[in-house]
């Protein structure tokens, strides 16, 4: 036997021996990992936050950062407040439809003086911004854990303050007055501007203890609670179990037009909530009741008349009938048109 051939045979034998020897070690290591991983994969899915998602999904996280969803709600800071509250020495006044509002800053806080629940004018501190563009609203804390949306919003394109109900005088005590239930964040708006929101309404006390896992519309608002997926992803690729949808509760790919449109519909439709929204992949009508083509909401031909968002009119369109889905025109992470 020639010396080169002998060397190759020896090398092959040594390599085979190393592979065979390493197999038990790999199996043993995986066996030690499995109990914890199995528990995480079988436990009820819980929300883990975008930082956990970003470890593997850097591209999607970068696209999402700075989007309308990312800025759907935030603490009132100089980076997030887009409205003109003056500069500490200058005040800004809005007046119209029987309402007056004075916007100003003091001690680093954003303040507004306007009509209160009793009809008297008082100062209120802005706690949160609400929305990013084309308008931004502002939330004020009230007793009972309530957050109320001011009636004057900032037009980010025209750069001006405007009244949300032009031509109407909404008196104190009216359901639509900004201090009443029609403009209550907890019950009317919160569900679609934060992730894993729990209203926490206590009927006997008529008070809220509202919580969220992330203040804005983050990854799990659309993908569902991600603990099982994160546990699955942390297993070495060759040892990952065959888990449906990689452990995610909500399927977002490989689904039909109706399923994908219904994924967006809870927050892009005028609808009523039938109960807690569990982000569990259930059909839309199991958790929400979309508004029908009621008079005053739509034009006779089905076009949008009032604030009905997108779902109701899109459902009537030729595009929907032909299988067009939201993500055919909109990037789901940047929320921009493609």
Write out the residue ranges for each language-model feature:
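Long, basic N-terminal domains or extensions that often function
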Residues: 188-193
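Primarily the internal scaffold of c-type cytochrome electron-transfer domains
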Residues: 30-37, 44, 51, 59-131, ...
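Hydrophobic membrane-insertion alpha-helices, especially the h-region
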Residues: 12-26
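N-terminal Sec-pathway targeting helices
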Residues: 3-15
